Regions:
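Active-site loop segments of alpha/beta catalytic cores
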Residues: 1-139
């Protein structure tokens, strides 16, 4: 819950511990990509993307992807950031539009489509299937 760390302590309490863990894993020749998810870190995402040594930065649904494209380290992959609430039945009216918007914005970047903070118990499984179909058929 990165947003709970005051900005002046984010490097010390958020970035440095992550970088230490990532560096240890990489020194052990771990070949799998390492994903960091500094939930609601706001503008601290910029320094996190450059200093944490993660291979992929997962973004929650509050991050504007156009901002991310301009500010996040372009050498790492971005993952995210569909609002999980859009999978809830009464909030799914704009689901396809939201998914396509994310895909359109990120189409020329290293990107993994994902929900911006996991599925909630009240999400509709048909909406999850719909998202999968949209992503699979996106051109």
């Amino acid at each position: 819950w990165s947003h709970m760390i005051p900005n002046n302590f984010f490097k010390q309490c958020g970035i440095n511990p992550t970088a230490k863990i990532v560096n240890i894993l990489k020194s052990k020749n771990i070949s799998k990509p390492i994903i960091g998810f500094p939930f609601k870190a706001g503008s601290s995402l910029i320094s996190y993307s450059y200093e944490s040594n993660v291979d992929c930065l997962a973004l929650d649904w509050t991050v504007d992807l156009n901002w991310a494209k301009k500010n996040i380290n372009s050498l790492i992959t971005i993952q995210g950031n569909l609002d999980p609430a859009s999978l809830i039945p009464n909030k799914s009216v704009f689901l396809e539009k939201n998914v396509l918007s994310i895909l359109d914005i990120m189409k020329d970047n290293k990107f993994i489509f994902n929900v911006g903070h996991g599925l909630t118990p009240d999400c509709k499984i048909n909406n999850v299937k719909k998202v999968i179909d949209i992503v699979k058929n996106y051109k």
